[in-house]
UniProtKB/Swiss-Prot annotation:
Induction: Expression is up-regulated by 3'3'-cGAMP production (at both mRNA and protein levels). Transcripts are more abundant in biofilm cells than in planktonic cells.
pH dependence as annotated: Optimum pH is 8.5-10.5.
Cofactor, free-text remark: Requires a divalent metal cation for activity. Likely has a bi-nuclear metal center. Has the highest enzyme activity with Ca(2+), followed by Mg(2+).
Alphabetized NCBIfam families for the sequence: HDIG
Phenotype upon loss of function: Significant increase in the ability to colonize the small intestine compared to the wild-type strain. No defect in biofilm formation. Enforced DncV expression in mutant cells lacking this gene causes an enhanced inhibition of chemotaxis. The double mutants lacking both VC_A0681 and VC_A0210 or both VC_A0681 and VC_A0931 show enhanced bacterial infectivity, and the triple one (VC_A0681, VC_A0210 and VC_A0931) has the highest infectivity, which demonstrates that V-cGAPs play non-redundant roles in cGAMP degradation.
Organism in which the protein naturally occurs: Vibrio cholerae serotype O1 (strain ATCC 39315 / El Tor Inaba N16961)
Catalytic activity of the protein: 3',3'-cGAMP + H2O = 5'-pApG-3' + H(+); 5'-pApG-3' + H2O = 5'-ApG-3' + phosphate
EC id: 3.1.4.-, 3.1.3.-
Chain ranges of the HD domain: 39-155
Protein name: 3'3'-cGAMP-specific phosphodiesterase 1
UniProt entry tagged with the keyword Hydrolase: yes
Assigned keywords, A-Z: Calcium, Hydrolase, Magnesium, Metal-binding
Amino acid sequence: MRWSEIGCTMKSVNIEWNVNLRQAFFCIARALDSVGVDDINHGHRVGYMAYSCAQAMEWSEEECQLVFALGLIHDCGVAQKRDFYRLLENMQPDNTQQHCVRGNELLSNCPPLAPFADAILYHHTPWDELKNIAISDRNKRFAALIFLADRVDYLKELYPRDEYGNVTQEARNQVCLEIGRLSGSLFERDLVRTMQHLLSKEFIWFSMEHHHIEAMGHNLPSTPFFEQKLGVEEIMSIAMLMANVVDAKSQFTFQHSQKVAELCQHLAKELGLNVEMQKALYLTGLVHDIGKLHTPEEILHKPGKLNESEYLCIQRHSTDSRYTLQMVFGQSVVCEWAGNHHERLDGSGYPRGLQGAAIDLPSRIIAIADVFQALTQARPYRGSMSLNEVMNIMRHEVSCGRLDSQVFDVIVRNSQQYYQLSIAESPTEWA
């Protein structure tokens, strides 16, 4: 079956392989901030303080912006709320190594960010240890500064705000005293002196609102790193990083995005779509659920039926995905396809209630891949399903006119291979 034989329109698609690196960092930061809901925008504040301190230290503009970006995503190894809460237990919490190692692995597997992976690995390492570790001077400085900014953000939350929500002068003084006490042991001395000077000014405290930080971040001068033109594989690696952050939020969705991506790619190939379309659908599969990071964990993990309000939270994730991806990928069709993955041919889907020819072939492919993969995975309210169970449910959806019959026929012809691909715990090669 070729796509030209399928009863839906296939408009000419111009796939733009561009990514806004600045927006990608903010996107990941916003996603991570959704994990620690009791300390929202932590990554924004750490990035901003690190950037401000680096500027005051007269680092190059490139390095200032890099440490800002790394500050935004420094906790990319934090998967769930419980991991985040451990970081709030004390000044030197136990078990920080796990999320540092995971963050290092995520960046190491993303070529554009791999040179900075060591800064994430050591961002909770005391200075009296870090100074003797054999990593680049740049990553050592980045790690030391991110650690300092991270702990300043932790310290300020130990003190009550005034009646208008401002950090009190007493709290500011105590923060400066505490980092000064740990200068030379936990923190690098020059960084501490510079940070203390910054914290003595009202400007830095008033600028810690996330909208101020994003406005500043979007208006920074051009630098080579952020203006570079990424290749397709590099863009894929950033999408994979985003997918890993999404999938780690719940043990029930582990590798879901990656598997949907693989299913999409195979379906596109068997339907005769060209290689560029196959890659674009793979990319869409990786990022289709990015909006789910705003969905509360208690809803994702609920073992029973969702009530009306909870279901509304679930429904909004595809819209959140669309707009989040537009900030990173611009007007790429990837954003539209990701936003359509819960649309159904009979108009019963969400969020726009599209039907029939209004749903293009790529959107139909990702809808089927998403349903198929979800059924093969365990969920809080059920175990994983057998191939027969999966196929029976999907046949019902097709017969009711919700999912595309001819795309589904591709799965029918190779159902065992698609099932094995979907349940495998690592990327699957399939000729």
